[in-house]
Amino acid sequence: MVTVRPTEKGQATALFAVVVPVTVLFFLGVIDYMITNARVMETVAAADLAAHAGAQQINLLPDGTIEPFSSQASVVATSFFAAQAPPEASLGGISCGLIQERPACRVSARVRSAGWLLPETWINVNAVGYLAYGVTEDDQ
């Protein structure tokens, strides 16, 4: 009569079959987060630069008053955003004028998430660039 001893054969295979997919999903999630975060940071930087560039176009009148509604401000902000934004970003809108009783430009944009693990979604980004008194384009 042959005695069969229980062995641990196959235990490593079962553990491998469980651990590998979980590890792969974890790393896909990390990569998805990193790519999405990089895209959002680039879009925030482009929107911030565009908002400040637009704010610098606000006119300072000879009597010291500020004329906040400049037609050039939106054009300059749009061109700065187009030059600096990542390809996944799209410009939502630009409004220049008085924001919280201060001359400024507001830039809104959207950027797509990576969509590797989680479904691809749009992330909204807003930036406001205030005019620092005494710092217009002519002063630089």
Name the predicted role of every residue range.
Residues 2-74:
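Alpha-helical assembly-interface signal, strongest on the long, hydrophobic N-terminal helix that forms
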Residues 41, 60, 64-140:
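Short, conserved structural patches
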